[in-house]
Amino acid sequence: MVNPQKVAIMDNFRDILLADDKAKHETIPVVISSRIRLARNLSGYRFVKYACRDDLRKVADKCEDTLKKYFLFKDKGAFSIKSLLDYEKCALVEHHLCSQELIQDFNESRLVLSGDNMTSIMMNEEDHLRIQVFGSDLDFKAMFDEINVLDDYLCENLDIAFDEKYGFLTACPTNVGTGMRASVMVHLPALVMTKQITNIIHAVQKLGFVVRGTFGEGSEPNGNFFQISNQQTLGLSEVDILSRLIQIIRSVVEYESNAREILKKERQVWLYDNMGRALGVLRGCYSMGSIDAINCISLMIMASDMKYIPQSIKYDLNKIMMKSQSAHIQVIEAKPLKQQEIEIKRAEILRKFFATVPDIKFE
């Protein structure tokens, strides 16, 4: 039987991908996106790893019934992960709306999305609830205000596990306390090209923060995209964590900007050649793998930040990078595709978009 809630959500997901945005989000150099995530659990139930299916179903039902009454999810039911096709699950991971863990162990896992896909709630992942709010810049105040209101609502309407000494209780001890993970996706091609990235990663880690690949723990930084997040959740307030993260990101942005200046002065022809070749490939490809695509688009995002192509198209570049991922292509086509079909379709999407991108104007 077709789940109408799942169909409506995937249709909305597809519409957002295909929309020609008029009010585009403001972007800043180096920063791609940001996220605040809260881990919460219900009192009286075992953590997900140790709970029986019946208890997990009860947890999900309670959470879903409560969320349906919240204005962001008014009359929106959660949908079961097991109701999704494989490529639909993968698209949600590619879009960072849910984790790889949620789609791998999905017996009683559910997901709720806001209409704009900027807020998502995972049920029965590692914790009973994983609440996420996304942004396109460093405006953590607005993001925190939004997630804090939602969290207050859940705490008022559900019996959330909380200890006066330790704070919010979570399945993983490293999340105990605030239960908050704040992260920023940054684009650091120049630090990689100038071989400074290892030193930067070590410096960030010494300050108590973690640097991971594009899709978090265990993933590769394809296209030189890195995720920086807090490691400590106990003994610090949410405001302290966010303030420290913002300071670190600003420092990383400065180091990346300085590395780009070094490339302009010392390896100018090499830099221009790489950017020019990437644009040529994107305009002329007829079959393109996902890694090649993200590496070429990465150079175009760098070119936009450095004003070699209009900065105004950076948002579009970020979006085309998402649309050209394998599962997203299948969502757009609304059917599963073979690998060769995906690579041909990806090339078609990229050719069409980059035909509209102005030629690179080097200094």
Where in this protein do the model-derived segments appear?
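Conserved phosphate/anionic-ligand binding catalytic regions in large, soluble enzymes, centered on
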Residues: G167-V186
